[in-house]
A protein has these predicted regions:
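Conserved MFS/SLC helix-loop-helix module at the cytosolic interface between two early adjacent transmembrane helices
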Residues: 62-105
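Extracytoplasmic
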Residues: 11-45
Length: 176
């Protein structure tokens, strides 16, 4: 029925909106926690900049187009589910960043964190491109702009929540 299709569209949009909020929270929270991370791991400002910006952004920007192409040729929903799992897993691994000792060789906590932030960027690259395509598939031209605007509001909601949660975590717990 038309009512069922409308509910399905709106439910899908709500799920995409919530996923986008979490996507943005993850990007913003690290900015609030960076001084705690810097102190805990003994990072310098260059390392901090690489971890918060470069490591994430290079992979995110580089992988966005290939991931979008995969989403267009396979299952958009499937790409989003896999991407969500990747970025969630790597986000959790960020909190476990410690030096790794392999015999006499040591991988520094900075390198571990850099690699995990790159993994987060890889996962998050599969968020918005398939979401935009799914919204375009679900909503007819006359309603598509509003649907995309609602989805995009997740950016601002995620930023607000990311800064709030980051501040709270920094005071109440620790960055890990």
């Amino acid at each position: 029925t038309m009512e069922g299709a409308r509910k399905h569209r709106n439910y899908a949009l709500a799920v995409l909106f919530v996923v986008y909020i979490f996507n943005i929270i993850d990007r913003q929270i690290v900015n609030i926690l960076q001084e705690d991370i810097k102190a805990d791991l003994g990072l310098n400002d260059t390392q901090l900049g690489m971890m918060t910006g470069l490591a994430f952004a290079v992979v995110y920007c580089t992988m966005g187009i290939p991931v979008a192409r995969i989403a267009d040729s396979t299952s958009r929903k499937g790409v989003m589910v896999v991407s969500l799992a990747i970025w969630s897993g790597f986000t959790a691994l960020c909190g476990l960043a410690n030096p790794i000792h392999i015999g006499t060789f040591t991988i520094s906590a900075f390198v571990v964190l850099l690699i995990t932030r790159m993994g987060v960027g890889l996962g998050e690259a599969g968020g918005s491109p398939p979401a935009h395509a799914m919204i375009s598939d679900l909503y007819e031209k006359e309603k598509r702009g509003r649907a995309l605007a609602l989805y995009s509001a997740g950016l601002y909601a995620g930023t607000l929540l990311g800064y709030y949660l980051g501040g709270w975590l920094s005071e109440a717990l620790n960055w890990r």
